[in-house]
From Swiss-Prot:
Record key words, sorted: GTP-binding, Initiation factor, Nucleotide-binding, Protein biosynthesis
Region (G3): 83-86
Organism domain of life: Archaea
Segments for region (G2): 44-48
Similarity-based family: Belongs to the TRAFAC class translation factor GTPase superfamily. Classic translation factor GTPase family. IF-2 subfamily.
Segments for region (G1): 19-26
Protein name as catalogued: Probable translation initiation factor IF-2
Amino acid sequence: MSNDQGSQFLRAPIVVVLGHVDAGKTTLLDKIRGTAVAKREPGTMTQHIGASFLPWKALEAVCGSLVSQIRAEVVIPGFLVIDTPGHEAFSNLRRRGGSIADIAILVVDVLRGLEQQTFESIDILRERKVPFIVAVNKIDKIPGWKSFPNTPFVESVKRQSEAAQLKLEELLSYIIQQFASLGFRSDRYDRIRDFTRVLALVPVSAVTGEGIPDLLLVLAGLAQRYLKGRLLASIAPGKGVILELKEEAGLGMTATLILYDGVIRRGDIVVTGGIEGAFSTRVRALLMPKPLDEMRSPEDRFLEVERIVAAAGVKLVAEGLEKAVPGAPLFVAVSEEEVGRLKQLVEEEISGVKFERDVVGVVVKADTLGTLEALVGYLKKQGIPIRVADIGPVVKRDVVQASMVKEKDPLYAAILAFNVKILPEAQDEAARHGIPVFQERIMYKLVENYQKWLQETRDAEVRKAFEKITPPAVVQILPGYVFRRRDPIIVGVRVVCGRIRSGVPLITKDGREIGEIMQIKEHDKVLDVVSEGAEVAISIRSKAIVGRQVKEGDYLYSNLSIEEINRLLEKYEKYLAENEKSYLRKLMRFKMGLSKEIEYP
C-alpha cells in the first residue's frame, strides 16, 4: 500500500432504489441518470460497473434555485447510485449487522399507495438499519394534473388547479396513514422541520421529471447532515461486497464489486466467500466502462485501471471467482499473513447466513448470500422454522434433509427455492418421497405459496380427523317407508341435520340406544355418506322393533359422548353448520342431565 494509507476523506453515499413492481423504480433511476447527463455540466455522470456516480456539480445544476435551501456547503462528492433496483440487489449490499447502502429511495405509486413489496422493502430497510426517503411517483397520472417537465415539485404544484391539488392531498393523506400504521411519522418533504423524526415524502414523476430536483436535494441534505460520520473513508486496504458474478468473453468469471471503503489495486490479494467457504485470490485486472464514444466494438467495453478508491463499482478479474457468491464480503489483504485472519472473518460472516441445524424445519435455497439472508429473515418473521439455509441449486441432499423432517412433521418437509434451479436427480427424489418444492423469483410469492400449501395441508389433515369422529346427525323415519321392522331394521329416512354414514350409532329422543347404521342405499345404489336433505333407506343392526321402541315419524339422533361433543365444538367448529352446532349443544344439555330429552328439532 502507498504511504498515504490511513488518510481520511468523505466518500459518496451509496444509494439504492426499492419499491413494489411497476411502481417506476427503473424509470426513476433512468430519469435521475439522464437528467444529470443532459445538463452536460463539468464533471457529469460517470458510469461505473453496477452503479452510476453522479457528481454533486452536475446535480447542483439540476436542482437549480432549490440548492439555496441547503444551508451549508455541500461537501459530499456526489452519489453512487446502484444501477439495479429492487430487493435482490439491495440484499446483496450486505455487511455484518447492516448494509453498505447508506440511504435508499423507496418508490411508491401515488395512486396505489403502499403495496406488498413496499412493505417487504420497509421491513428489510428497518432490519438493515438503512435510512430512506419516499419518492411518491406518477403524480402526472393524478386526474387534472398539468405537467411541467423537469420542474421542482414545489413550483409545479403551485401551477395546478385546486381540484388536482386536493386530489394530491387526498392521495398523500392515505399514504401518510399507511406509514402511521407501521409506526412512521411522515409528511410532504416541504412541510418537515426535523428530518430525523419525520419520513420525507417527495412527490415526483419519473416520466416528466417533475420533483426530481426536490428528490436529489432532500437526498443530498440528509446525506450531508446525518451521514457524514458514516461516509468517512480512508486510503486503507479496501472493503467491498460482491454484487453479482458474470462470465465475460476472454475474461472468464468476473465479479461486480461495490467498494465502500479504502482502495483496491491490480495485483492485490483479496479474500472473499464462496459456496465452499472463504478463499483468497489475486486481482488480475480492475475494469471500468469505457465512455461510449471510445468503444470500438461490443467486446471493447472496458478500460483497465490500476486502482479504485471508495465509493465505487468496479469489475474485478481474478482466478477462482466461479467459487464466489454474490453478497459475500471482499477484503484486501496487505500480506499473506493477514489472509488467515480475513478468511476467518469471512467464514464467521457467511456462517451467520448459511447453516444446517438438527431441527424440524424447511430447507431454503437461494441464489446469493444476500437473498438467502433476506429470505431467512422473512421466514423467521413468519414463524417458519428452518433446517437448512444454503446457496445454489436444489440437490439430492436437500431432498434427503426434507425427508428426515417428514418423519417428524410432514408440514415442514418442504424445499423453498428462490431464483435457483432444481437438479433433475433432486426432482426425481422429491417426487419419489412426496416432498413439495416451491420455486419462485419473487420472495413474498415464494413464502405465500408455501404458506398456502401449509394451510391447505393442515386443513386436509384436520378434515381427515374430523371425518373419523361420529358426525352430528338427525334423521326422521319416513311414514310408510318401513321395509323391515326387526334386526336388521330397514327404514326410509330423511336427513334433517348433518350427515350420516355407516357405523354411526343412533339413539331416540330420550336416549334409548337403537343401534348402528349398517348400510345406506338410494335406488339400490350403496352410498358411503349422505347429507342434510337426502332421503334414503338405511339398515340398522338393532334389538329394537319398529312399532314398539321406535315408530314411524320418530327422530333418531347420532350418539356422541360429551368428550366428542366438546372436541367438535372446540377444534372443528369451522367445519360445522349452524344447525349442527345447535344440535350438539342440545345433545350436550341432555347428556349432562339438564334436559329430559333431546330438544331438537
